Structures are given as structure tokens and as C-alpha cells.
Amino acid sequence: MDEDAVPPLGLLLAAHAGGAQASRHRALWAFDARLAKIARTTSEPMIGQMRLAWWNDVIEDSTGIKGQGEPVVDAMRATGACGAPGLVGVIDGWEILLVEPDIDMKGLRDYASGRGGGLVRALADAADAPDWLAAAGQVWALWDLAGHVGDKALGQAALALAVEIL
């Protein structure tokens, strides 16, 4: 997997994970980045949902056949990250951004809970992550969204919700 597939923050945090966990963390950050690209480049929500459904099929494929040759999939499988808890939540979080053009506060909460909460559960390899860890993931997801979204009002709403969660 090309390290360019991993955002800089993910590379930094993976480096701090160290050892075998570093590769696993890079794969998980690349997974989130790949889903972000789907959300960013999809103009038709149904097409985006189909692309996200493919990723869902990949992480639930116990045979290890689906997605072979795709660098992020291969990295996730090589590090055992495909079985990590929270991955479906990450997909669900990104899907909210695809299907809700006028996202409200509930939608933002669901997005943050799915994407951020799911990613930190996957990184920690803990299905029952403590509330503070899930909250940290939610705040990160909202902060990241605010920094990348073109809609100023949505970015401000995301930051306001992040402050509320803190």
C-alpha cells in the first residue's frame, strides 16, 4: 500500500503505535481515506452507496477473495484489520454524508458516531471502547469534516457539535 494513501495525521499516529500495530493503523487510516474519496468524488448518492456497499462486502468477506489486489484491502487483510470492530460504522458514517444533502444535527451526530467512533474502535481493536474514546473519535471526525467541507455553515455546525461533545 502506498503511504500516499494515508493522511498525514494517520501516518503520525501510526508511527506512534509502533511495531506491528503501525502497519495495521496505516491500513485503517487508508481505509477511512478511501471512503472519504468516495464521498468527495461521488455526484450521485446511489452510485456512492454502491461503492460503499462494495467496501462493506469486502470487510465481511470471510473467504478473503472479494477485493483481492486492491492495495488498501490487501493491507487490511495482511494486518488483520478487516475483522476490526467499528468498520461498518465508518462506512455508515460516510454514507450519511452521501445521502443527506441538507444534513441536520442528528445526521451530523450519526456521521460522527459512525465514522469517528467506528474508526477509534477499529484502531483500538475494541468493540466496547470507553465512552471517552468514542467521544474523542467523534470530535476528530467533526473537526476533519469542518476542515474539508466546502459548505461554511456545515463546517461551523460540525465544530459547534464537536465543542458540545467535549
What are these model-predicted stretches?
Residues 1-166:
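Acidic catalytic motifs of isoprenoid enzymes
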